């Protein structure tokens, strides 16, 4: 799937938004990918994750033994990637501000984990998720995401396999360009809700 095809899926779902957005990283952007709108359509989610699963298989073969995603944004693509790859799909969620496995989910030292995210911007949530997995003794071999907003600049600590890259400028709140300063900011993400 090409970058244009991926972005067309987001546009068709009404998920490629323009305005002034506060990202989960705290940075500001004039573009927001509202993946919840994409994930509300099972067929669209399946198409995107099927393409990502093919890309992961081309790079990793059968190496992953389990998929782990960070809640909340990674749960739907993590589930669909697990379905596409025939693997178990788990997720970590925040407890007292830190990601942890709950709900009876367990990993062992023999598990080779593929982390699945929706969108990667700075890689912070990814690194926090990977840190939680590392504490279990399992090995994170790579991360996969639908869109890498950093254009390949985010360091998640393991190889990052993105269905596409879509570099979108993001700014600290005190360094906004005039066009963003003129628009009220909204915070559409999920960080800080739990």
UniProtKB/Swiss-Prot annotation:
Record-linked Pfam families: Pribosyltran (PF00156)
Question: Does Oxidoreductase count among this protein's keywords?
Answer: no
Instruction: State the reactions this protein catalyses.
Output: orotidine 5'-phosphate + diphosphate = orotate + 5-phospho-alpha-D-ribose 1-diphosphate
**Binding positions for 5-phospho-alpha-D-ribose 1-diphosphate per the UniProt entry:** 117-125
GO molecular-function annotation terms? magnesium ion binding; orotate phosphoribosyltransferase activity
Question: A Gene Ontology biological process annotation?
Answer: 'de novo' UMP biosynthetic process
Entry keyword set: Glycosyltransferase, Magnesium, Pyrimidine biosynthesis, Transferase
Q: Which InterPro entries match?
A: OPRT, Orotate_PRibTrfase_bac, PRibTrfase_dom, PRTase-like
- Which EC class is this protein assigned? transferase
Q: Which positions are annotated as binding orotate?
A: 121, 149
- Pathway per the UniProt entry: Pyrimidine metabolism; UMP biosynthesis via de novo pathway; UMP from orotate: step 1/2
What EC number(s) does this enzyme carry?
A: 2.4.2.10
- The answer to whether the entry has keyword Glycosyltransferase is yes
- Name its co-factor(s): Mg(2+)
Lineage: superkingdom: Bacteria
- Entry function: Catalyzes the transfer of a ribosyl phosphate group from 5-phosphoribose 1-diphosphate to orotate, leading to the formation of orotidine monophosphate (OMP).
Protein family according to the UniProt entry:
Belongs to the purine/pyrimidine phosphoribosyltransferase family. PyrE subfamily.
Listed under subunit, the entry gives: Homodimer.
Name used for this protein in its record: Orotate phosphoribosyltransferase
* Organism of origin: Maricaulis maris (strain MCS10)
The gene designation is pyrE
């Amino acid at each position: 799937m090409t970058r244009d095809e991926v972005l067309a899926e987001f546009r068709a779902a009404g998920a490629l938004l323009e305005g002034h957005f506060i990202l989960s990283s705290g940075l500001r952007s004039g573009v927001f990918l509202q993946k919840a709108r994409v994930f509300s359509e099972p067929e669209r989610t399946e198409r995107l994750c099927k393409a990502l699963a093919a890309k992961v298989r081309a790079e990793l073969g059968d190496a992953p033994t389990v998929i782990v995603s960070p809640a909340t944004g990674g749960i739907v693509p993590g589930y669909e990637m697990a379905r596409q790859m025939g693997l178990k799909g788990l997720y970590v969620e925040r407890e007292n501000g830190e990601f942890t496995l709950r709900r009876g989910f367990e990993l062992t030292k023999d598990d080779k984990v593929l982390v699945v995210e929706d969108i990667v911007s700075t890689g912070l949530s990814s690194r926090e998720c990977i840190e939680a997995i590392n504490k279990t003794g399992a090995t994170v071999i790579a991360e996969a995401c639908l869109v890498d907003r950093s254009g390949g600049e985010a360091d998640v600590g393991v190889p990052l396999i993105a269905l596409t890259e879509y570099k979108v400028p993001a700014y600290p709140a005190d360094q906004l360009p005039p066009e963003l300063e003129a628009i009220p900011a909204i915070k559409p993400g999920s960080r800080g809700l739990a």
